[in-house]
Amino acid sequence: MTNNSAPKLSPQLAPAIASAILGGAPLPTFDATMTLDEAYGVQHDVLGLCAPEGLAGIKAGMTTPASQSFFGIDKFLLGGICPKTVQASCWAVPFRAGRLIECEVALRVDGEGRPIACAPALELVSLNFARETDMNATNLLAANLGAEFIVLGEFQPWRDEFADLAISLSHNGMPVNSGAANDALGGPSLSAGLICSEARVRGYDMTPDLILMTGACGQVVPAEKGQYEAGFGVLGSVCLHIN
């Protein structure tokens, strides 16, 4: 009899992913096909190894119809923010090939999932797959959506005008991206509730003071050497140096 069974999910996958993330190494190969539920399970194991002290926040990814269509899914995905990956504005980081930079809105919410504070933010993402064929939604989800670093500006008490922010990103003084706060999941107010609701369904520990990252505003651009500054109108700005 011919054995046509698909490769089974290895219990060593989560430790291998965590080791790669912590060491800045390429991800392991992904030989088994996962469902979204299985991928979230692997991600939770990965986060338990990368951040045993608990998460600093939760990030949303695949927050636009275009990104969902590209990966063949019909809803946004979530990842965890490890405490040691959160940096203050104007932080400097060594260059790493293949890294991407996103403009995002960072939130803190109340117990009902309503925004109470907001900050400008940049996210550095590294999709460090060993094989191009491994790049799909469930593998990316298992690998925590490629989250590498979060760079935060100053939080301000929530104001309704933050829902309509225009956002711009410059690299060495030249514009490289523009967008709006409502590019991601319809804007901060709507995204806060959506992220909190999905996070509870997916088993994240919703502790007080979590940072919520609402998704990319505008385009995702390659992170090159130099100085980046993102302006968020009345919310302020956030900067990053890549050496």
Model-derived features: positions:
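C-terminal terminal-subdomain/extension
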Residues: T2-N4
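Extended mid-to-C-terminal alpha-helical interaction segments
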Residues: A199-G203, T207-P208
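Catalytic-core "active-site belt" of small-molecule-metabolizing enzymes
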Residues: A6-G187, A192-L194, V201, V221-K225, ...
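Thr-Gly-centered strand-to-loop micro-motif
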Residues: S178-G179, T207-P208, T214-G215
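Loop/turn positions that initiate beta-strands
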Residues: T207-D209, K225-Q227
